């Protein structure tokens, strides 16, 4: 499993407007329906009103490659340009071992 954190930063509320447009236009729902997509959610940092965090999770690199080759990417690129967003990306590959036993004591279930 591959998890991508995309930090979209803009000005004058552009990042939030971008995320809202992605949801209202149905693009976010279409991405969630793509084969191999496991998660696609936007979050808003309390201390940075001009940034939006997208957590995007995929089964494998092939699913990401198919997503990047889809016609949807042109829509996303156009919206990024419209709102003049800049991005920072973090990529995580899961090791599937779960949390170590010693860390579980800090987790309330």
Show where each model-derived region lies.
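Short S/T/G/P-rich N-terminal loop/turn motif that feeds into the first structured element of a domain
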Residues: 1-52, 57-69, 81, 85-109
């Amino acid at each position: 499993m591959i998890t991508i954190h995309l930090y979209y930063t803009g000005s004058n509320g552009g990042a939030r407007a971008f995320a809202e447009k992605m949801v209202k236009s149905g693009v976010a729902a279409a991405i969630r329906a793509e084969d191999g997509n496991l998660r696609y959610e936007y979050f808003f940092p309390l201390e940075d009103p001009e940034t939006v965090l997208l957590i995007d999770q995929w089964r494998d690199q092939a699913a990401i490659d198919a997503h990047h080759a889809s016609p949807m990417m042109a829509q996303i690129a156009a919206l990024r340009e419209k709102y003049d967003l800049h991005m920072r990306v973090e990529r995580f590959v899961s090791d599937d071992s779960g949390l170590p036993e010693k860390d579980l004591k800090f987790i309330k279930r």
